[in-house]
Amino acid sequence: MIEIPSDFSEQTAKFTQILAKFNRVHSLTNYKNFDEQISDSISPLKWLKFYPETAIDVGSGAGFPAIFLAMILKDCRWWLFEPNAKKSSFLSYVKAELNLKNVSVKSCKIEACEPFVAQLITSRALMKTKELLKICRGFYDNETQILLYKGSSVEGELDGLDAQIYGVKNRNYVFLNVKRDWKENE
């Protein structure tokens, strides 16, 4: 079982202050209740069956879920891919302010980077599942766990995929096991 570190509340309070300040100027997110988003970010950890050493977050935006997962999974090396310059600058600032040494921010689309295999890939409401798998090709292998934060209607996106879905309120947490040689028309 993955435990919440003792400094998590302090870290999330700092994050919330930083995001509120940046959001007034840069409109990084439309979320009003950051505590709900933080809770949503960490909720699927109870179903994660292993402690990853390497993880990728695709389309990291304002840091949900990756920043909070990185706060908890401190021994995991995180790469956050965010092509939007103001959002990636914000993420870099948060990384420095919160001293998140296990986080690297990549200011580019994942498909523009040299592939490397991660043990965990996360993404929150970025795009359709099979499109995400296409752009992440080369970053996963048969052992990689993919965790997607999806809305209430996700089943049609998962045809032909090995998926476990955990539903909470209007959120579906989808854990995928995808073979490295997965093809869209399988």
Curated annotation (Swiss-Prot):
Q: Does the keyword Chloroplast apply?
A: no
Q: Which InterPro entries does the annotation name?
A: rRNA_ssu_MeTfrase_G, SAM-dependent_MTases_sf
Q: Which compartments is it annotated to reside in?
A: Cytoplasm
Q: Which reaction does it catalyse?
A: guanosine(527) in 16S rRNA + S-adenosyl-L-methionine = N(7)-methylguanosine(527) in 16S rRNA + S-adenosyl-L-homocysteine
Which keywords does UniProt give here? Answer: Cytoplasm, Methyltransferase, rRNA processing, S-adenosyl-L-methionine, Transferase
Could you say which enzyme class this protein belongs to?
transferase
Query: Which EC number applies?
Result: 2.1.1.170
Q: Give a GO cellular-component term.
A: cytosol
Query: Does the UniProt entry include the keyword DNA damage?
Result: no
Q: Which SUPFAM superfamilies match?
A: S-adenosyl-L-methionine-dependent methyltransferases (SSF53335)
* GO molecular function annotation: rRNA (guanine-N7-)-methyltransferase activity
Write down the superkingdom of origin: Bacteria
Name the residues that bind S-adenosyl-L-methionine.
Answer: 59, 64, 110-111, 124
Q: Which residues form the signal peptide?
A: none
What PANTHER family does the record point to?
S-ADENOSYL-L-METHIONINE-DEPENDENT METHYLTRANSFERASES SUPERFAMILY PROTEIN (PTHR31760:SF0)
Q: What functional role does this protein have?
A: Specifically methylates the N7 position of guanine in position 527 of 16S rRNA.
Q: What is this protein called?
A: Ribosomal RNA small subunit methyltransferase G
Organism annotation: Campylobacter curvus (strain 525.92)
